[in-house]
Amino acid sequence: MKFTKSLLLLIVAVFASSNAAETFSNFQVTNSEASSPCVTTPVELKVNTCQSACGSILNVLPVTGSTSKFTFNQFGAQDTKCAATPTSSNEFTCVDGKSKVAIGSTTYSVVCVPDKTNSSESDSSDSTRIGASFALAAAALLSMIAL
């Protein structure tokens, strides 16, 4: 009976630590063209979400059923602050699966910006949740050893 309780505590701890996922609200896109460098924070997105895709890079929502094509709105070069209405909407395809995407001959660097507005997903709550999970796992292991 004690062994079963300990095993259940260990399983709960593993699930609790795996649920400490980071959420993302914005994206930063840098244009590689020197003639029209443009950094947008955030990029205007079709869907304001962040997903794991193209290997290790976190990108915007894939285009219908595609795992390598994504959509974002491209700002015009005349808009130096990149704050006006986007000039067009584009699809981009992952190039190296890490951090670069290309539209035609232009390469963009895409970086997810962590969402810090949601208090339940803040750094402190994540570290607290993870710390509590490890403490629970340690307690479960100690009680199993004591048997």
From Swiss-Prot:
Give the residue numbers of the GPI-like-anchor amidated asparagine lipid attachment.
Answer: N118
List the propeptide residues: 119-147
Compartments it resides in: Cell membrane
User: Among its keywords, does the record have Lipoprotein?
Assistant: yes
Molecular functions per Gene Ontology: actin filament binding
Naming one, the record's GO cellular component terms include:
membrane
Instruction: List UniProt keywords, sorted A-Z.
Output: Cell membrane, Glycoprotein, GPI-anchor, Lipoprotein, Membrane, Signal
Output the PTM entry.
Answer: The GPI-like-anchor contains a phosphoceramide group, rather than a phosphatidyl group.
> What membrane topology is given?
Lipid-anchor; GPI-anchor
Q: List the disulfide bonds.
A: none
For this UniProt entry, which residues form the secretion signal? 1-20
Q: Which domain of life is it from?
A: Eukaryota
The entry annotates sugar attachment on N118
Family recorded in the similarity comment: Belongs to the ponticulin family.
Protein known as: Ponticulin-like protein C4
